[in-house]
Amino acid sequence: MKKVILFGLLLSMGVATAFGQKSAVQVFGVPFGSTYEEFLTAFSEKGFTGKTYIYEGGSDVEVSSIYGTFMTYECYIEMRATKLTHTVYKIKISFSVTDKYKDIPGMEQCRAIISRFEEKYGKATLIQKMHGGKVVQDLEESSAAIWHLEDKIDLELFYRGFDDCKVTYGGKEALDGIFQKEVDQYNQQKAQEIQNQLSGSDF
């Protein structure tokens, strides 16, 4: 299993600043260099809700403080804890596009995930993201033109391992399939608890 690196990212006033990996690890309480399964377990045990960025493929953030831009790809997961299922892991993909960095480690993994989505659900539209208070129209204007999958296509990929990019589409379909057993077990357990409470009451 490949290693993953947690990191935080701030893009403000046209300057991209990458927080240190150690600070991100301290915040989330997951040891640096943990495997994918290890930090998923840690997050799940904490009942964590929110977003965390992960790097996969052995490439660190490329930062140019001189020009106030950065250039790299992102693969990140969004995790939320629910009462009816185990923690649900969603993946959304965003990545930078310039000729200079198009072949950095990990870019192929991002492309593979997007390709699988497109094969099943149609073309995934790429749009420009705000940078420094404006939409970057010209890649030569700023190397920090970040592209991401358009939100309205509702791309939520339940993820089954970065090693081979196994992907299934998220949403109700996945909840009804992958997690239905857990949902049923939870519902049965709660129903029994309620029944026990009622049988022991005066009502």
Regions found by a protein language model. Name each.
Residues 11, 70, 82-84, 136-138, ...:
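Sterically constrained small-residue positions within well-ordered secondary structures
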Residues 17-19, 82, 125:
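Intrinsic disorder/low-complexity segments
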Residues 4-14, 18:
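Sec-dependent N-terminal signal peptides
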Residues 21-60, 95-203:
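Non-cytosolic coordination micro-motifs
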Residues 62-111:
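Mid-chain, structured segments of secreted extracytoplasmic proteins
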